């Protein structure tokens, strides 16, 4: 079943470039200067730590974005990794309308990966970031991710893992903005029917990204009292 789904995803991706070729380059979105995606390091560290509860983030490894990609600025001891994702971490396949978030330099999405997700999922987001920083289009990013996964250059996802996204200072981009504090569940091959078929954007568990693929993400909103405010030290 998994091999079939991967094959279907690869076939779907194969048709994307043809559609893009019909759109003139003048109409295609453009990347802002990379400097617009960057932050002062103290502010980024504080924002990254706001991704999860203090008992997690205070002992987590912290990564920040540089012109060379994400780099470790603090080594933790609990296996969690916190960082601030940018629009580069947009869905690879669906919802299609959010794939262009790669061009939105305002996105700031603090996240704290659990130890399993730090090993299996974070490299996927770091690859997406690398490709976007090379000015690849969403379709070229999809092709790069597919190829890397097929070659075994990205970890295979053999089970569910999760991440906290509890920051009160999150900006998830145009059309979403500031959403509920939530838990990201990385659930390979899930679709929305498997979590109740809830409406996208509702304050209920839902499949948010890349349904039916190895990169599927379920989001589970939590109480607003759990929001964590970024505090620079």
Placement of each model-derived feature along the sequence:
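Bacterial N-terminal signal peptides
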Residues: 7-16
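Sec/Tat signal peptide C-region and signal peptidase I cleavage site
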Residues: 17-21
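Positively charged n-region of N-terminal signal peptides that target proteins for export
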Residues: 1-4
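Primary mode marks residue(s) on the alpha4-beta5-alpha5 output face of response regulator receiver
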Residues: 23-233
